[in-house]
Amino acid sequence: MMSMEGPFLAAVIARLADPRFNLAAHGVAFAFALLIEAPVIMIMSASTALVEDRLSFKRLRAFIYGLNGIVTAFQLAILIPPVFRFIMLDLVAVPEEVADLAYWALWILLPWPGAIGYRRFFHGILIRDGRTRLVALGTGVRLVTMASTGLALFFFLQPPGAWVGAASLSLGVLAEAIVSRFMAESSVRKLLATEGVTADSVTGDRAGEELTYARIWRFYYPLALTSTIGLAAQPMMTFFMGRAIAPVESLAVFPVAVS
């Protein structure tokens, strides 16, 4: 279902003013948002594997809150105007018209990494509890919210297309995060009522041993590194296209092609 987001938003942006610049800015902003969220994207695997009682739930929840704060602060640092202009204009070398649109799109995408980490934490809890259908339901809520936001902005306000794409993605994932928390309520109650640690085929810890932050970090950092390396490809392609022939056209067609 999530694969429908890209083609839908590209179609909406292409029908608004200045589609060439806005498709390019949407692609640039989304590429950087993906890279920023990369460290939190594997939290679902961590919560599926590690959360088995009250203590492990609270420890991993605190860990993901801290990680969400770090990636959000990193995005805020990128949005400091001199830093942003250095990255976009000097390093990536995107045209200034594209950079200006991408700047505000990244502001609109500010809730994106934290909401991704939050909802994937609760997705893992749902999966561990065997309630996988609710994960699909949450994705459906995300798609409906994303599409409704995009269409409402298209028909009633018609802001720049890059901002429409960013707002649709942000509101969609925020809606999914909120719904996932409510859907996981009964699973969370069961975890909070469970004392002690049962064992662990995944981490290899001894039965009865607490899940410490050090163990969470040892388990999680290879996953975070894997997702960061994998998702770095799109920003790298943006870097090369910004310095290639016809950069605006290349940046505009790239999000359409990969969607």
Feature roles, as predicted:
Residues 41-48, 108-127, 135-142, 164-181:
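Short runs within selected transmembrane alpha-helices of multi-pass transporters and secretion channels
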Residues 25-76, 119-127, 254-259:
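Small-residue-rich hydrophobic transmembrane alpha-helices
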Residues 27-30, 68, 106-109, 113, ...:
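Residue-level recognition of transmembrane alpha-helices
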Residues 105, 138-152, 156-192, 196:
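Hydrophobic alpha-helical transmembrane segments
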Residues 73-103:
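Short membrane-interface helical motifs at transmembrane helix boundaries
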Residues 1-4, 106-110, 136-140, 179-182, ...:
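Hydrophobic faces of transmembrane alpha-helices in multi-pass small-molecule transporters and flippases
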Residues 3-24, 89-96, 154-158, 224, ...:
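Helix-terminus/linker motif at the lipid-water interface of multi-pass membrane proteins
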Residues 96-119, 259:
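Alpha-helical transmembrane segments of multi-pass membrane proteins
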